[in-house]
Each structure stands twice: as structure tokens, then as C-alpha cells.
Amino acid sequence: WETTDAAKEQILWGLAHADVVKISDEEVEFLWGITDEKEAAKKLLDEFGIRLAMITMGPKGAYLANQNGAAYAKCPEVKPIDTTGAGDIFGGSAVSRLLKAGKAPEEFSTEELGFIGQFACTAASISTTQSGGIPSIPEEAAVLDRM
């Protein structure tokens, strides 16, 4: 983007057309100056009509929320080597669990949101222990074993 205003405009357009959103705490602060993940999730759900908001907070974990509830997920402690792709791996891992469940995003319970978040946080954390983005994507069994 040529300017930060242009970036914000395009990101906000994308949010207005999304059902499931994975967004980082840094991106939330950039867009709205919000530093509280609960407030950010509420904004996404209520003002943008997002059906499932996933706010990632780096090594601190993630906060997942829909209209049924919300859950925090903690990341396992690791010694990171390369964080390239960790956010993408979180998003892809979360979406894999959503698709496996075969439910609408707003139908997940607080417990299910917690499991999805924990799975995605674990996958992202494992990925940081290796170099590279794609080569560091862990297998499902490795993620489940680490949980």
C-alpha cells in the first residue's frame, strides 16, 4: 500500500466481507488503537458481523469469540528459531479444525473454541522451532501429541 490510510481502507473492506477472521493484536491496534482482545472481538462481531473472530497475540496465545461465547488459548512454551509463517499456520490450523467439525462458525461452543484455539496455537508454536514457513508446518498428529 502507498499509505497507511490506504492499507486501513482495504483491510476494513475485507473485514466487512468476511465471516471468519484471524487478526493479530498488532493489526487490531493499527486499525482502531484497541489493545484489549475482548473489545476487539466484540467490535468485529457486533460492528462487522463477523461470525468467528480469532485474535492472535504471538507467544501469549489467542482469543477466539463468536456470539455463543469466547475462549483463550495459550501457546506452549518453545524456543523459537524462526517465526516466519506462524500466523498463517495458526489460521490454517484453525480453519482445518472448523472444516473437520462441519459446523457454522457461530455454532461452536466455548469449549470447542478453546480446543480450536489450542490446536492452532500449538501448531503455530511448533512451527517456530524450525526454519522456514512451509517446511515448518507440523503434521496433525504432532500437534495433537503436543497438546
For the regions a language model picked out, list residue spans one by one.
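Conserved beta-alpha-beta core of the PfkB/ribokinase-like small-molecule kinase fold
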Residues: 1-43, 51, 60
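Conserved phosphate-binding/catalytic region of the ribokinase-like
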Residues: 35-147
